[in-house]
Amino acid sequence: MSDLILQASNLEKEYRDGKLKTPVIKGLDFELRANEKVAIVGSSGSGKSTLLHLLAGLDKPTGGTVSLMSQAFSGLNEVKRGRLRNQYMGFVYQFHFLLPELNALENVMLPLRVRRTPSKDAEKQASALLDRVGLGHRIHHKPSELSGGERQRVAIARALITKPACVLADEPTGNLDESSAQQVFDLMLELNQEQNTALLVVTHDLKLAAKMDRQYQLTEGHFILPSETL
């Protein structure tokens, strides 16, 4: 069985305003394999978030293909794309997007409840994962009662609760101070190893990116050759 999780081939994306065309991604190829940790870095406006949305099947490319677990998004309707994402992907964003009316435990349980996991089983799994990320004593607190770092830990737990094949993270530490950012990022790397989950992170922080197995610099719609980190 192939260990290839996510693949993009000759990927292109352009935006149009009347006759004006603005290319953002230009003929890009990319692969993410099982258990890999990969960072995409680039300046603001370089197209990093656009690329992540394309790789997640959340946006349609102008050209080329994206495949998740050997299934091309282009060959699936919206419902089937959603099912494929929900089965194999987890997401962490710069803004945590936790539901404010739910506590930490309930937020982490949500993906399991969507899958119709029995409530008691979902609660047990969510509680154990929150304990693993250091929030076992905060499971009944709502997002407004948590610090920025704690909220992001809850978001990480929510992304991992279904044991996805890969996690896509868009500036996951962008709203945190340096100390909290280091702690949260290191936690993501630890969980990547523990759960055998591939990790793709978009970040502007070169120090954090240096901790990954591979780095890609996105410049003018292309990747500069990846550098292998030691």
From Swiss-Prot:
Keyword Acyltransferase: no
Membrane topology: Peripheral membrane protein
Binding site for ATP: G42, S43, S44, G45, S46, G47, K48, S49
Annotated localization: Cell inner membrane
Gene Ontology CC annotations of this record: plasma membrane
Pfam families the UniProt entry points to: ABC_tran
Gene Ontology molecular function: ATP binding; ATP hydrolysis activity; transmembrane transporter activity
GO biological process: lipoprotein localization to outer membrane; protein localization to outer membrane
Location, primary (coarse class): membrane
Domain ABC transporter: 6-230
Domain of life from the UniProt record: Bacteria
Enzyme Commission (EC) number: 7.6.2.-
Transmembrane segments annotated in the record for this chain: none
Keywords for the protein's UniProt record, in alphabetical order: ATP-binding, Cell inner membrane, Cell membrane, Membrane, Nucleotide-binding, Translocase, Transport
Family matches, as PROSITE patterns: ABC_TRANSPORTER_1 (PS00211), ABC_TRANSPORTER_2 (PS50893), LOLD (PS51244)
InterPro entries according to UniProt: AAA+_ATPase, ABC_transporter-like_ATP-bd, ABC_transporter-like_CS, ABC_transpr_LolD-like, LolD_lipo_ATP-bd, MacB-like_ATP-bd, P-loop_NTPase
Family: Belongs to the ABC transporter superfamily. Lipoprotein translocase (TC 3.A.1.125) family.
UniProt xrefs under PANTHER family: IMPORT ATP-BINDING PROTEIN (PTHR24220), LIPOPROTEIN-RELEASING SYSTEM ATP-BINDING PROTEIN LOLD (PTHR24220:SF689)
Subunit structure, as described in the record: The complex is composed of two ATP-binding proteins (LolD) and two transmembrane proteins (LolC and LolE).
Role: Part of the ABC transporter complex LolCDE involved in the translocation of mature outer membrane-directed lipoproteins, from the inner membrane to the periplasmic chaperone, LolA. Responsible for the formation of the LolA-lipoprotein complex in an ATP-dependent manner.
The protein, known as: Lipoprotein-releasing system ATP-binding protein LolD
Organism: Hydrogenovibrio crunogenus (strain DSM 25203 / XCL-2) (Thiomicrospira crunogena)
